[in-house]
Amino acid sequence: MNSKEITTQISKAADFLNLKKWDYGASFSNDYSVQVDKGEAKQLKASQKQILTLRVWNESNLVGITTTSDISESGIKKALNQANIASDFGNKNERTEFSPLAKDPIEVKDAKKRNPVGIKKLLTILREAEVKLLESHESIKSVPYNGLSESFYERVYANSDGAFRSYTKSQAALYLYARAEEKNKKPRSSGSVKLGYGVEDIDIESCIKDASNKTISHLNYSSIKTDKYLICFSPESFLTIINAFSSMFNARSILDGVSLSNKNSIGEKLSTEALN
């Protein structure tokens, strides 16, 4: 059943239950991943996931919400009925409405459609990559952490007001983490990650080279002289700091009263002058 058919199914079920206002968000995905250990398959995984989150408004305009993975006719009716029952316990202090952007088209960068290569092909590619990485330098003794995966997913939103938005995407990732050992030196490890829309987009040779060079470079270590050093933080480090305190400006946390901020905090400083 595709997303259009699911939307039609939900609409019919809502009419049957006499539910006038509803919306739903859905996520469908197919994931494949492999790991190897010295040429042998260590882990092979394939999964198919589907989850629907449905909201129903009652006559008092209170919202009830439920989730389900059962997209059969009976499963959808049951989920809508549960959301309708839950709406009786909706928060009267928060009146939720459809987003004004619900009917706007989603701007998605066009990309060539990728197809799954399958578990067997993933395993073959990763085995070859492991062998090449081990052969790239005599000091690299193992590749303890590695993985090759591909995911294909679809996101959908639709409501009783006629909105329907969806997009499909794919992604693939290769991860190689090598361990090098030399006499009278501590073992050192490093790795590399490459991403792409599909496995065919990943530069496998570059990933092998990066993992090898980084790992070997770590063997040439020496102690750092105790002294005072000027440290320059990257822009990303400040984003990490802000993310660590994200509850300060998370809307849900503010509404629930578990944030240091409140509804009147807009415009106030978040940091000290030293960080500014």
Feature-to-residue mapping (PLM):
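Active-site bordering "gate/hinge" segments
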Residues: 1-276
